[in-house]
Amino acid sequence: MIALIQRVRRAEVRVADRVTGAIEAGLLALVCAERGDTEAAADRLLAKVLGYRVFSDAAGKMNLSVQNLDGAGRAGGLLLVSQFTLAADTNSGLRPSFTPAAPPDEGKRLFDYFVAAARAKHPVVETGEFGADMQVSLVNDGPVTFWLQTHA
């Protein structure tokens, strides 16, 4: 599975002009399931997303995770948005191939699993809508962006 995480001051996702998820300071994670991914890969990716140290401590060093945003135990927001295009094969030609992405039914199942697992482990989880045409807006903080990937 893949997650492109961005440290944000705020972010929101809309579907048909309706806000489906919004957070203040935290992480926006664009999430993609690849062919052959499993719940175990989703669990490993979620552990990375929740534990990845991308927020600055008092000394200015990236040493804090979204679970401990301020060093005093305050959790930041986590906005999860499905994005199958992260799995695109761009190695040949000028049109991406999405063959590496999980089929839609499997992608939805794994994204739903990922969201449920995140909600069980983190207090502030918002989402987009799988397969919908979404408008995502955010205010990057830094910017700080990381590509995280786990394999089945």
UniProtKB/Swiss-Prot annotation:
Disulphide bond pairs:
none
Alphabetic keyword roster:
Cytoplasm, Hydrolase, RNA-binding, tRNA-binding
Q: Where is the signal peptide?
A: none
Query: What Gene3D superfamilies does its record include?
Result: D-tyrosyl-tRNA(Tyr) deacylase
Per the annotation, the residue ranges of the short sequence motif Gly-cisPro motif, important for rejection of L-amino acids are 142-143
Localization per record: Cytoplasm
Which GO biological process annotations does it have? Answer: D-amino acid catabolic process
Q: Which reaction does it catalyse?
A: glycyl-tRNA(Ala) + H2O = tRNA(Ala) + glycine + H(+); a D-aminoacyl-tRNA + H2O = a tRNA + a D-alpha-amino acid + H(+)
Enzyme Commission no? 3.1.1.96
- Main location (coarse class): cytoplasm
For this UniProt entry, the molecular function terms from Gene Ontology, in alphabetical order, are: D-tyrosyl-tRNA(Tyr) deacylase activity; Gly-tRNA(Ala) deacylase activity; Ser(Gly)-tRNA(Ala) hydrolase activity; tRNA binding
HAMAP family per record: Deacylase_Dtd
Subunit details: Homodimer.
Q: Which PANTHER family match?
A: D-AMINOACYL-TRNA DEACYLASE 1, D-TYROSYL-TRNA TYR DEACYLASE
Q: Tell me, in a sentence or two, what this protein's role is.
A: An aminoacyl-tRNA editing enzyme that deacylates mischarged D-aminoacyl-tRNAs. Also deacylates mischarged glycyl-tRNA(Ala), protecting cells against glycine mischarging by AlaRS. Acts via tRNA-based rather than protein-based catalysis; rejects L-amino acids rather than detecting D-amino acids in the active site. By recycling D-aminoacyl-tRNA to D-amino acids and free tRNA molecules, this enzyme counteracts the toxicity associated with the formation of D-aminoacyl-tRNA entities in vivo and helps enforce protein L-homochirality.
What does its UniProt record remark on the domains? Answer: A Gly-cisPro motif from one monomer fits into the active site of the other monomer to allow specific chiral rejection of L-amino acids.
Per the record, the similarity remark reads: Belongs to the DTD family.
* Protein name (Swiss-Prot/TrEMBL): D-aminoacyl-tRNA deacylase
- Lineage start: Bacteria, Pseudomonadati, Pseudomonadota, Betaproteobacteria, Burkholderiales
Gene giving rise to this polypeptide: dtd
